[in-house]
Amino acid sequence: MRKSDVFLVDSQLKCLLLHKIFRNMAQLSNRLQRLAPSATLAMSQKSSEMKAQGIDVINMSVGEPDFNTPDAIKEAAKKAIDDNFSKYSPVPGYPDLRKAIVAKLKNENQLDYTVNEILVSNGAKQSVCNTVMALVDEGEEVIIPAPYWVSYPQMVLLAGGKPVFVEAGFDQNFKMTAAQLEAAITPKTRMIILCSPSNPTGSVYSKEELKALADVILRHDDLFVLADEIYEHINYIGKHESIAQFPGMKERSIIVNGVSKAYAMTGWRIGYIAAPEWIVKGCNKLQGQYTSGPCSVSQKAAEFAYISSQQCVEDMRQAFERRRDLIVKLAKEIPGLEVNVPEGAFYLFPKCSSFYGKSDGETTINNSTDFAMYLLEKGHVATVGGDAFGDPECFRMSYATSDENIKEAMKRIAETVAKLK
C-alpha cells in the first residue's frame, strides 16, 4: 500500500470517529450542551499529560492546598471506621456535625444559627449548586462579579437562569462596588454570588464594602446573596467579615463554607450552607434526590476538625502568607506583569495584557488563554488564563505549593516571557 493510500485511510477513519463523537454529543440533553468544561481542570489535565511524557511541569493551576490533612483529623476518621460508622447518613448531615458548625458560626463569626438552618453536602461545590437550583427559576438573573470562579455561571445556566456579569477588574482590586450592584439589578434579579476571599483574585471585601452591598440588597425585595466563604481562614488582613452579619441580611444570605481549604481536606468532600430554614429544606429536598447525605466517615473527620484545636489552620495560613509574599515579590520583578497584592486565598491574578500581540518568532500571544498555554508549552509552568474567569487581561497562579516550586516557576516564567518581542 502506498503512503498516500495509508494517509487517505487514516483520514477517513478520523472523519468517521469525529462524526460519531459529534452525533453522540447531539443526543445529550440541551441543558448539558449549555455547559462548558472546566478550564481549570482542563489545564490541570494537560499538565498531567505532559508529566506522563516525562516533562518536568510545575503545576500552579489547581486550587488545592498542598498540605496533608492534619493527623488528628485523620485519626478521628480511622476511629469512625473502627467503630463501624459506615451506614447511610441523614440527608442534611449528622446532627453532631451540624451542631459543631452552629458553634463555629457563633464563636468565630458571631452569627446565630440553629441546627435546622445547616445543610451538609458533598463539598462546597454541591452546596453552591444546591442553592442555585433551589432558588433560581428559568429566566431569572444572577449577578456575578467578574472575575469569578469558573463554575458559578455554569451552575446558573444549568438551573435555567441567566448570569449577569459585573466587571470588577484590576484597577478596582477586583471588587464590585455598591453603585455597580445597584445598576445591575433588574426586576428579574434573584441572586448575587459573592466570593470573599476570592477565587481567582485573592481579594477580600472589607466590612464597610460589604455593608454598602448589603444596603443595596435590602432595598430590593426577594433578592438573595450566596456568600461563598470557603477561603475564610486563608485571610491575611485580619478578621473575616460575613455579609450575613448586618441587620436584615441573615434572612437574605446563604453562607457556603466547608473544610476543604482551611483543613486541607479537599478529597473528604464536606461543605455546608447556613441559611434560612425554608431554603435549607428546599436544598435538602433536592439533595435527597441527587446524592443523599455525605460520607459518614468524612463527617466525623469534619466534626473533629471544627471542635478541636485550630492551630493547624493558623499554621497553614501563615505558610500561605509567606508564600504570598514570595510570589508577589518575584512577580513584580518580571517586566510586563502588573500585580495586585492578594489579601486572602492562595491565588495571584496578575495582569498579562502587555504581552498581547507579541511573539517569540513561533508563537503569537493574542489573549490570556494563549499566554497560559505559552507558559505551559514553552516554560513548563501550568497556570490558567483569565478568560476562563471572565477577565481577559489576567491569568491565575496558585501558590499552594512549596517555596522551591514557586521560585523555580517564577524563574521559568521570567525567562519564557523575556523571549516575547
Located regions from the model:
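Conserved N-terminal alpha-helix of the aminotransferase class I/II PLP-enzyme fold
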Residues: Y88-S121
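PLP-dependent class I/II
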Residues: L8, Q12, L17-L28, L32, ...
